Amino acid sequence: MANPITCDEILFERHPMLSSLARFCVRRRRIVVFGIWIPLFFIVAVVSGAMKGDFRTDFVLPSSESREVQELLEKANPNKAGFSATVVFKGDAVLNTPGLKDAMASFLNQVGAIDGVDTMSPYDNPQQVSQSGNIAFARLDISNRSQAEGITFSDEVQEIGVATLTNVSGVQVEYGGEIFVKFTVPESEALGILAAIVILVLAFGSVLAMGLPIGTALLGLGIAVSTVTILSHATLMPDFTTSMVAMVGLGVGIDYALFIVTRYREGLQAGMSVEKAVVDAVDTSGRAVLFAGVTVIISLLGLYVMGLSFVRGLATGAAIGVLVMMLASVTLLPALLGMVKHRIDVTTRAAIAALIVLVLSALAAIIFHSLPVLLLGLVGAVAITALSFVFRSLRTPIPVRVTKARELTFWFRWSRFVQRRPWTALISSASVLVLLSIPLFSIRLGFGDTGNQPEETTVRQAYDLLAEGFGPGVNGPLFVTVQGDTAASPEKLMAFAGALSQAENVAFATPSPLSATGPSTEIDGQPLALVVVYPKSSPQEKETSQLVHTLRDDIIPATGITAKVGGFTAASVDFADYIGGRLPYLIGAVLILSFLLLMAVF
């Protein structure tokens, strides 16, 4: 009777296409590296740098009350349908500070002259002054802008502030709102790369064996991020897409390259030639890389079933990142392996010393936010490398670590343990998975706000000052659109705002003019007005979500007035409800597509 074919034999079956591709990459390694990948990197980097990104975070549901509010405000006054921002002032009896009134008037006049901006001064609205009188805020309503336009606007407003407000002594000025958030390179990704470098060097005992996966992933990441930046002009992508690409791309890029490098080193240790070892690595581990990559891409594209435009853009960007990493792993990496040949296991004293200097300087640069420290480390690493050409001792190879026989390794013995006691392994692992899944049943979905920013940033300080003076809810106002006779009557509108102010968890509510001529405007033949409601709880608290539902389901219907609750905070509540309802469809789509892929492969 013939022996059955195992899954390993199917997965690692020799594939003529992969074999031919690997052989081409080894034999034409200079063309692959210097004629394809590196030029591609510079081309997309230059193009993306010239075009800039056109990322737009369009948090609009297909059908929701917050969407209806958004559409009404866009018709009435597009500035009210975009970003809400604040300029916060703190000082003793701040509005009585000599010179502040004139300086603030000059500031708001110049900011209000910018296209698509409405301003409201605390001198015109007492509710924008804290009870202590020490904190006040000016409100800015800004029309929707792309990420690049938002950065330009933020810089322009703060430049106006420097010119008009800094001469007023005794007053602290901070700028709050998402539009003033400055993009910084996430420290987590940089720390992750440093951790990967240290772990891989310890695991492989070789700088080159570590450097190839890291280098391949970084080059692929640069191409992926630049490509996504270019594509943001063709399809809607949120402004955090590049962070998602970096997070997913680095993870899979290093992982996929590790598969192939490990198999290549095993081939060399088995006595294969360089070309044969590369071909064998791509034939086996490369096939696993393609299978794993396609599975991840399918899972990401499963996000399309959510039916949200910004989620589709996010999924597309992350899928592009994974695709680039897959291609780099089976083309660029084999070419690099063909270049280093047997030197992949050779590490000199100079290489280790240069790596230590570089890692420590990079860590210090991240901790102290100092680019000169990183540059100093780079200079030190280059100097050590240069000195190795003068001092022979620096070129001395570090003894190669003795590799244990396969049967003596921990993972070999672990696999045998699992095979001998399958039920023990199954029950134990299933129990751990169940325990880890318990928090899922109490998860609350939503969006972060500027309260999550670092404490030293102006947006976080503005957030904290507003929370100190008015309560945390002032950082997440609710926009209530009012239609009908109430909108046309200032007295009735004030009475309605007063009724909303009496609701539990409402700090205060105030009408907000929709036009320069008065508090209301006419849309489709019907008066429309806006009331801004400030909760007592912060935007991310459960009580704020409950307030949105209470206003919609109980308080507003009881008044008999036609009004709808929207704004960013209400939209985040709608998103949480919508996404929670769509999660089963997402999970089902991913499982079905993955099952079909497994059926096709096996």
Give the predicted meaning of each segment:
Residues 63-84, 91-175, 447-602:
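Structured non-transmembrane domains adjacent to transmembrane bundles in polytopic membrane proteins
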